[in-house]
């Protein structure tokens, strides 16, 4: 949680929290989820702004397993993961409805993603490739089920990174 003080009502952008990307909820691009259940309309003022918040809650579960040993001096490992979380605002923002934290909407405002990954471990360097699949987005999509991704291809994220995600 970040709380601005003094005469400021919002924390500096560089200090705000975000979710999504290679080290967060891997089914989504970086800073594309939240805050809360807010989702900018296409071509609106906020459609090109990275989404950040004052509160962050994130959980990651990952099972890693060996695929091949001693492959060109390293080990090839696999991973299956489940990521969940979101960011919220501390104060109500009229320009971004449903962006503030609310216990009543808590479970519906959690983004959920799963996926598979490959890790090449050289013991001094880990290269990884993750393929994330979105299961739930916190905003309204017109689908009333918990799996509310309109099209499968819209709910995928591929990330290449160095090092483990956590």
Mark where each language-model region is:
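Conserved active-site loop/cleft motifs that coordinate metal ions or position small ligands
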Residues: 79-81, 126-132
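C-terminal outer-membrane beta-barrel translocator/porin domains of Gram-negative envelope proteins
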Residues: 1-75, 80-105, 140, 144-146, ...
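Repeated loop/turn-to-beta-strand initiation elements of outer-membrane beta-barrel proteins
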Residues: 68-71, 120-129
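Transmembrane beta-strand segments that form the barrel wall of outer-membrane beta-barrel proteins
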Residues: 45-47, 129-135
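A carboxyl-terminal module marker
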Residues: 113, 128-130, 153
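Strand-loop-strand
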Residues: 94-122
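Outer-membrane beta-barrel "beta-signal"
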Residues: 122, 152-166
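Transmembrane beta-barrel architecture of outer-membrane proteins
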Residues: 56-60, 111-115, 155-157
């Amino acid at each position: 949680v970040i709380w601005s003080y003094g005469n400021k009502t919002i924390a500096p952008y560089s200090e705000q929290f975000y979710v999504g990307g290679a080290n967060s909820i891997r089914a989504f691009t970086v800073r594309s989820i939240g805050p809360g259940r807010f989702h900018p309309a296409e071509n609106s003022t906020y459609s090109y702004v990275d989404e950040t918040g004052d509160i962050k809650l994130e959980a990651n579960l990952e099972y890693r397993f060996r695929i091949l040993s001693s492959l060109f001096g390293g080990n090839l490992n696999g991973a299956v993961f489940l990521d969940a979380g979101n960011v919220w605002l501390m104060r109500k923002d009229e320009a971004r409805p449903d962006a503030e934290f609310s216990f009543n909407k808590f479970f519906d405002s959690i983004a959920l993603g799963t996926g598979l990954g490959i890790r090449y471990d050289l013991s001094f360097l880990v290269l990884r490739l993750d393929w994330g699949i979105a299961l739930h987005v916190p905003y309204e999509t017109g689908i009333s089920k918990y799996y509310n991704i309109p099209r499968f291809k819209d709910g995928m994220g591929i990330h290449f990174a160095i090092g483990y995600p956590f």
